[in-house]
């Protein structure tokens, strides 16, 4: 007989990911993402001076994707920010968390706020057909579009509407073990690449270390995701972020591309755009994934005048062909 604990050990074994429309109920180990926490009486005030969102306006039952920028308005990282325990927490890509935290802490010595990485808490994604019903058998209350965050003892649950309903579970070890014991045999299991694939489909920007301090928030559609407040007080990089809006300085946007390729590009790679008989290098890859059906999906920052008629390809891959896919939101200024 298989020992339950070894059968469902984290991280889960990697399978090729599925598009949201093809995905069966799946639990996803989010080992490529990492958590940080902030507690103390000055936390809201301190964060207000560091991130693009209006932290004071974030409700207890809400979460927001915002950016932490350098003085030039370039993003160290984007952060999924929410209330957690006695303070706040945020989730970002693991490969840049330590650098981002050291930047975030630079001025915290003058504030009553404690900022720390948290690797004891477990991050799990839950997505696919019937996942709400399965989670409802474990948790007495689940978040939804109107109340996107629900707190339980040892568990913070985040709701995402796109590309199809999914959940991000922020769990203490005990609730995590209990969840896996109850649902482990009723769901598929996969690793971070499945969640990354859903983020690409949803147009949620992925900032890895290769692209840290490279882009202003608007180049990754953060304004369209309500991640930038243009009415709050000062924060690091605000002047450049505001200039991009009011002077039309931003000429880039985030795109979801799909098609065929012989290789999956890496974060930081450029792509090629077809111009008649020729191909011209363009853009920057943020993330990419090869799906179960062989398709390759790419999330890239490109000139914001691209449209569905444009054809792109992975650099130096003559057989590659990628086209622009519709995002579930309008790109605004």
Curated annotation (Swiss-Prot):
Stored PANTHER family: TRANSFERASE CAF17, MITOCHONDRIAL-RELATED
Official protein name in the record: tRNA-modifying protein YgfZ
Keywords linked to the UniProt accession: Cytoplasm, Folate-binding, tRNA processing
Subcellular location: Cytoplasm
Keyword 4Fe-4S: no
Main location per the UniProt record: cytoplasm
Entry similarity comment: Belongs to the tRNA-modifying YgfZ family.
Sites where the protein binds folate: 33, 195
Any Gene Ontology biological process: iron-sulfur cluster assembly
Top-rank taxon: Bacteria
An annotated Gene Ontology molecular function: folic acid binding
Record's function text: Folate-binding protein involved in regulating the level of ATP-DnaA and in the modification of some tRNAs. It is probably a key factor in regulatory networks that act via tRNA modification, such as initiation of chromosomal replication.
SUPFAM superfamilies: Aminomethyltransferase beta-barrel domain, Folate-binding domain
Keyword check for tRNA processing: yes
GO annotation, cellular component aspect: cytoplasm
InterPro entries xref list: GcvT/YgfZ_C, tRNA-modifying_YgfZ, YgfZ/GcvT, YgfZ/GcvT_CS, YgfZ_barrel
Species classification: Bacteria, Pseudomonadati, Pseudomonadota, Gammaproteobacteria, Enterobacterales
């Amino acid at each position: 007989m298989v020992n339950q604990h070894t059968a469902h050990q984290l991280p889960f074994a990697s399978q090729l990911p599925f598009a949201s429309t093809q995905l069966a109920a799946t639990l996803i180990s989010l080992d490529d993402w990492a958590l940080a926490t902030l507690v103390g009486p000055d936390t809201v005030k301190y964060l207000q001076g560091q991130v693009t969102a209006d932290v004071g306006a974030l409700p207890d039952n809400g979460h927001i994707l915002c950016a932490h920028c350098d003085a030039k308005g370039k993003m160290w990282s984007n952060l999924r920010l929410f209330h957690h325990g006695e303070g706040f927490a945020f989730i970002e890509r693991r490969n840049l968390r330590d650098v981002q935290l050291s930047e975030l802490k630079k001025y915290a010595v003058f504030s009553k706020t404690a900022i720390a990485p948290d690797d004891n808490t477990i991050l799990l994604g839950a997505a696919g057909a019937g996942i709400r019903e399965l989670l409802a058998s474990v948790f007495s209350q689940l978040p939804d579009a109107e109340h996107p965050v629900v707190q339980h003892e040892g568990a913070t649950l985040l709701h995402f509407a796109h590309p199809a309903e999914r959940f991000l579970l922020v769990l203490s070890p005990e609730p995590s073990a209990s969840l896996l014991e109850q649902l482990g045999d009723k769901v598929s299991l996969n690793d971070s690449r499945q969640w990354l694939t859903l983020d690409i489909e949803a147009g949620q920007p992925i900032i890895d270390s290769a692209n840290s301090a490279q882009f202003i928030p608007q180049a990754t559609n953060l304004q369209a995701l309500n991640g930038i407040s243009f009415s709050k007080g000062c924060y690091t990089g605000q002047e450049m972020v505001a200039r991009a809006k009011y002077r039309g300085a931003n000429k880039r946007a985030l795109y979801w591309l799909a098609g065929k390729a012989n290789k999956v590009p890496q974060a930081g790679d450029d792509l090629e755009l077809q111009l008649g008989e020729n191909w011209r290098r363009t853009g920057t890859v943020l993330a990419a994934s090869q799906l179960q059906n062989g398709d390759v999906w790419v999330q890239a920052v490109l000139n914001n005048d691209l449209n569905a008629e444009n054809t792109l390809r992975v650099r130096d891959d003559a057989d590659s062909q990628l086209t622009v896919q519709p995002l579930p939101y309008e790109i605004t200024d």
